[in-house]
Curated annotation (Swiss-Prot):
This is Large ribosomal subunit protein uL29. GO terms for cellular component: cytosolic large ribosomal subunit. It comes from Zymomonas mobilis subsp. mobilis (strain ATCC 31821 / ZM4 / CP4). PANTHER family: 60S RIBOSOMAL PROTEIN L35/50S RIBOSOMAL PROTEIN L29, LARGE RIBOSOMAL SUBUNIT PROTEIN UL29C. It comes from the Bacteria. One of its GO terms (biological process) is translation. HAMAP family: Ribosomal_uL29 (MF_00374). GO terms for molecular function: structural constituent of ribosome. Keywords: Ribonucleoprotein, Ribosomal protein. Coiled coil: none annotated. Belongs to the universal ribosomal protein uL29 family. InterPro entries: Ribosomal_protein_uL29 (IPR050063), Ribosomal_uL29 (IPR001854), Ribosomal_uL29_CS (IPR018254), Ribosomal_uL29_sf (IPR036049). Gene3D superfamilies: 1.10.287.310. The gene is rpmC.
Amino acid sequence: MAKIDDLKAKSDDQLAVELGEMKREQFNLRFQSATGQLEKPARVREVRRTIAQIKTLQAERQRSATK
């Protein structure tokens, strides 16, 4: 799981790329879970939280840019 400080240091474009990668990984993990091939169930939670952190950072930056 990415540290929040590491995510804050990234640019908006880098965050967008990271979000895409996390969503892709979440999709793959969901399929692995459905087929019973998931080796690390905790990874699902980590990915979900990282996605939430990225979206929160993007929303904060958007709000501060409009002020």
